[in-house]
Amino acid sequence: RVIDSKGCRDIGKLTEVEKSLDRERGIFVIRNKLRNSAGRRKLGVLWLVLDPVAMSLVYLFVLTVVRSYPGIESLFIGISMFRILQASFMTGVNSIQDFTGGLISERVRSRVLVSAALRYRVLETTFQSSAISVILLFGLGVNLRAVLAFIILSQIMGILAEGVGLNMSKLVRRIPDLSNLIRYFMLLMFFGSPALYPMATTTGLHYKINEYNPFSYFVESVRYLADLESVIFNL
């Protein structure tokens, strides 16, 4: 086994026993991540499902009070997709703080950790998008094509965001103060991105900046397929 700055790996072919152990380790890592997400909360993993719904309802109330109501479908799509983006990115940033994957007795192969991280990202994103998908389809009458696009694009966006965060994780581990700057940046990005409102409502420099914002392409695509106000073909 070789452990260096590039990761933890073995030279040569793995035996069937080692492959079986890697699969079991991967499953353990995923379960450990779910336990960490649940914490000591009684609803546990269910909060992954409820969080996007709760946040959407909070901002729906706030925007209704200030008379800046963008449409409930557009708001639910925007906020839930940004929550997925944010969670995925921050998971990637914090991903290499622990090379054991929760297995204290040894360091797990990097391949196992990456595979487990990918599967967990798909699982968590499925949890996060499930309740919103049901609300969009059955509660708000959004067409099935748009709901499927919402689920698929959320998965793709989540994987890409975690990958970007993973690439930044070594730098953040070396300079811990960057984690605070990243949190401020994500907060700024939340209010600056077309999450609370369609991009069509932005003008000037605000619109121009969002043309270079990857999130805009994902969320505006879903809004277009949902027959909502969208500028996807102008980007």
Question: Where is each model-derived feature located?
Answer:
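Hydrophobic transmembrane alpha-helices and immediately adjacent juxtamembrane helices
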Residues: 1-235
